[in-house]
Amino acid sequence: MASSSSVPASSTPSKKPRDKIADWFRQALLKKPKKMPISQESHLYDGSQTATQDGLSPSSCSSPPSHSSPESRSSPSSCSSGMSPTSPPTHVDSSSSSSGRWSKDYDVCVCHSEEDLEAAQELVSYLEGSQASLRCFLQLRDAAPGGAIVSELCQALSRSHCRALLITPGFLRDPWCKYQMLQALTEAPASEGCTIPLLSGLSRAAYPPELRFMYYVDGRGKDGGFYQVKEAVIHYLETLS
């Protein structure tokens, strides 16, 4: 009986040191400051460097300010310039510098007789004053002084995308007009929309046989057919872009 009563007495003092040790470790852990793992810090630091190299602003990076590199603390203006688009707009019209329109000096050469100079000037004024700002060649205004007539006529055609033929009774009587008409057909036999006959003061029967394979603009309208000539020139220029 004496031996059985001695067992509780010996086990009681052995539990108290273990409880004290457990309490000491618990207090030590509670007092230990929390610290971010090294692997996580290095991961965030690498992320801030990657964002800086890609041109992103510091506010878009996931790293806190204390872990960001000096290079990532750039000014807002430098960040916005890094994100600005460098490619030009995709939209291109007939007036753009990338258009084939600028491969020649003029958009249209107005061919007319001497007695139709006033009508030719009105047509040129209409085309140049339009929203498209078409570049016109008018012989009396744009031909080089002292230049040979044949050379000037040929150069005017070769330096222009389109040819507007102001076909009138005076045009049919002028040998230079007929020469210019035949030269225009030689450079573009199939026309392809670049030769635009404007019939004015003539019947359909008087239409030159050399041009009867292509449609002409009727100049008997209220605007003298100027609008149709302008639209034909613009349509041809759009095929060049």
Curated annotation (Swiss-Prot):
Q: Posttranslational modification, per the record?
A: Phosphorylated by IRAK1 and IRAK4. Also phosphorylated by BTK. Polyubiquitinated. Polyubiquitination follows phosphorylation by BTK and leads to TIRAP degradation.
Q: Which residues form the signal peptide?
A: none
Query: Which Gene3D superfamilies does the UniProt entry name for this protein?
Result: Toll/interleukin-1 receptor homology (TIR) domain
One biological process term from GO is: response to lipopolysaccharide
Q: Where is the TIR domain?
A: 104-233
Q: Which cysteines are joined by disulfide bonds?
A: C109-C154, C162-C194
Identify the GO cellular component terms for this protein: cytoplasm; endocytic vesicle; plasma membrane; ruffle membrane
Annotated Pfam families = TIR_2
| Record protein name field | Toll/interleukin-1 receptor domain-containing adapter protein
Q: Which organism is it from?
A: Mus musculus
